[in-house]
């Protein structure tokens, strides 16, 4: 029996408004993460590690940096017809942009027809996690479902923040798909948990095509995969759930098994970075059996730490320090530094995410903050120390008190 022919479609058109100002000049999937990665690298690494090597990334909003990252990083050998390619909105069906995630795929059905897959894997582009998609595809084929939805077990008390899956008594068939219900139903045998939709789907190809065409013809539809297509197939009795907790990733540790983060807000984005900095991180970037791939410029030199005199020590603890960083007599604690960052003498960077080529001046303090690329913190200046002062200077402060500074800003007094 031959292996199924699989096409990967990655939904990467999100604007990510809740991540502003980090999305002022880039699409959400292009937002940097973890020092050297982009958010889109996680889903693409999962698909490629799983052996799914024909992938179209559907883009739309401010996609230049995302398109450039994909074309420079994800270059597959085309000897066997493999590819990872960005596909911008092309207005194939008329002079309009994508009206939703389902419309994005409907307008790109030529890709499906050209590839003629048995199965279409439709994954989102802006979550941090590891997953072996082969196991989800195997269950999909075994059950004969039209669509299989990846479900994440979360406490029932948090169900109002998610699309919630109610299963039939068999625990697999989806009986109902509820969008952010006030009183979500618990799981059979585990009433204090619910299945939250992860936004990852596996479709039988002809079922997907028929559903997209029916949805496109419905003027009342919101043309969304979770809001339109999945409920349609639930009603037809052909939808199943895949329990993400059952997914076994090669090389995964017990503590990071089942890790999944939606980093759609500034606070969740910040918290996911802090997850990386722990002594025993709940998400392990160093799994060699299931690597997260990205583009690291070969010309960037290693990190450098200088000065070791009383009161002036270049040091970083509980932190991720990327290539090209120079910590020159400053102290870095529980932070993530991207390539090219410079931390100068007597400065302190604590509980912070500092992106490429930002400069922290002498005796400056950066605390509980996110700095986008090319930010300059002048000598003696502070960021994140006085939240009211940060707001007065025009910097965004999140609900949890994280100060966020946009790209290319020089911090004002």
Swiss-Prot record:
Lineage: superkingdom: Bacteria
Pathways per UniProt: Glycan biosynthesis; glycogen biosynthesis
Any Pfam family: Hexapep_GlmU
EC number: 2.7.7.27
Residues that hold alpha-D-glucose 1-phosphate according to the record: 163, 179-180, 197
Keyword hit for Nucleotidyltransferase: yes
EC category: transferase
InterPro entries named in the record: ADP-Glc_PPase, ADP_Glu_pyroP_CS, GlgC_bac, GlmU/GlgC-like_hexapep, NTP_transferase_dom, Nucleotide-diphossugar_trans, Trimer_LpxA-like_sf
GO biological process, one term: glycogen biosynthetic process
PROSITE patterns from the UniProt entry: ADP_GLC_PYROPHOSPH_1, ADP_GLC_PYROPHOSPH_2, ADP_GLC_PYROPHOSPH_3
GO molecular function terms attached to this record: ATP binding; glucose-1-phosphate adenylyltransferase activity
CDD domains assigned: ADP_Glucose_PP, LbH_G1P_AT_C
Key words, A-Z: ATP-binding, Carbohydrate metabolism, Glycogen biosynthesis, Glycogen metabolism, Nucleotide-binding, Nucleotidyltransferase, Transferase
Assembly with partners or alone: Homotetramer.
Similarity comment text for this entry: Belongs to the bacterial/plant glucose-1-phosphate adenylyltransferase family.
Role noted for this protein: Involved in the biosynthesis of ADP-glucose, a building block required for the elongation reactions to produce glycogen. Catalyzes the reaction between ATP and alpha-D-glucose 1-phosphate (G1P) to produce pyrophosphate and ADP-Glc.
Name of the protein described by the UniProt record: Glucose-1-phosphate adenylyltransferase
Annotated source species: Parafrankia sp. (strain EAN1pec)
């Amino acid at each position: 029996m031959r292996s199924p022919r699989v096409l990967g479609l990655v939904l990467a058109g999100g604007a990510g408004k809740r991540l502003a100002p980090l999305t002022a000049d880039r699409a959400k999937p292009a937002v940097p993460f973890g020092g050297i990665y982009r958010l889109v690298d996680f889903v693409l690494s999962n698909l490629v590690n799983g052996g799914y090597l024909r992938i179209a990334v559907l883009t739309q909003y401010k996609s230049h940096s995302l398109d450039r990252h994909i074309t420079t990083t994800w270059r597959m050998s085309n000897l066997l017809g493999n590819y990872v390619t960005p596909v911008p909105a092309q207005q194939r069906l008329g002079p309009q942009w994508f009206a939703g995630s389902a419309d994005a795929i409907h307008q790109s059905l030529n890709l499906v027809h050209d590839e003629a897959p048995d199965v279409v894997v439709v994954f989102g582009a802006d979550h941090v996690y590891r997953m072996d998609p082969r196991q989800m595809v195997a269950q999909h084929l075994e059950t004969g479902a039209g669509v299989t939805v990846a479900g994440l077990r979360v406490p029932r008390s948090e169900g109002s923040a998610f699309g919630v899956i109610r299963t039939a008594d068999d625990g697999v068939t989806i009986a109902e798909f509820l969008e952010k219900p006030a009183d979500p139903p618990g799981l059979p045998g585990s009433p204090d948990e619910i299945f939250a939709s992860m936004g990852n789907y596996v479709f039988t190809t002809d079922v997907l095509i028929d559903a997209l065409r029916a949805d496109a013809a419905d003027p009342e539809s919101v043309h969304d995969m979770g809001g339109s297509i999945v409920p349609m197939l639930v009603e037809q009795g052909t939808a199943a759930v895949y329990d993400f907790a059952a997914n076994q990733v090669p090389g995964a540790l017990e503590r990071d098994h089942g890790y999944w983060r939606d980093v759609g807000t500034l606070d969740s984005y910040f918290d996911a970075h802090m997850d990386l900095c722990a002594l025993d991180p709940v998400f392990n970037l160093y799994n060699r059996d299931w690597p997260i791939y990205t583009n690291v410029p070969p010309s960037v030199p290693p990190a450098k730490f200088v000065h070791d005199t009383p009161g002036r020590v270049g040091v970083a603890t509980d932190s991720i320090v990327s290539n090209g960083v120079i910590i020159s007599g400053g102290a870095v604690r529980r932070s993530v530094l991207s390539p090219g960052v410079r931390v100068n003498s007597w400065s302190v960077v604590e509980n912070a995410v500092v992106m490429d080529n930002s400069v922290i001046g002498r005796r400056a303090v950066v605390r509980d903050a996110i700095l986008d690329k090319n930010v300059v913190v002048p000598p003696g200046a502070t960021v994140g120390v006085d939240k009211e002062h940060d707001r007065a200077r025009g910097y965004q402060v999140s609900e949890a008190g994280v100060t966020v500074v946009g790209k290319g800003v020089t911090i004002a007094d």
